[in-house]
């Protein structure tokens, strides 16, 4: 399902204009992105958590030149679904 399909679905279920739904969806994504950029996690009860994970520095190999390279410590965005959400997906796809 794409973002456009989500907007259409929400619009049809709520009766709210697509333009208004799009603004709300875009604002939600913007808040999540900005929070994570600032190192804050976002928790949505019953859905899941958008968390910032720290990746440690590690040594990797450049196989074309056969040299070792250092990948510095960095942060990556991650999503951890809520247990309720995981259970519904497990039982719903039969």
Residue spans for each PLM region:
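Strongly charged
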Residues: 1-94
């Amino acid at each position: 399902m794409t973002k456009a399909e989500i907007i259409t679905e929400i619009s049809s279920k709520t009766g709210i204009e697509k333009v208004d739904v799009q603004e709300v969806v875009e604002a939600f994504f913007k808040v999540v992105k900005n929070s994570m950029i600032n190192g804050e996690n976002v928790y949505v009860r019953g859905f899941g958590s958008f968390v910032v994970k720290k990746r440690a520095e590690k040594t990797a190999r450049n196989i074309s030149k056969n040299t070792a390279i250092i990948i510095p410590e960095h942060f990556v965005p991650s999503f951890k679904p809520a247990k309720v959400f995981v259970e519904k997906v497990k039982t719903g796809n039969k």
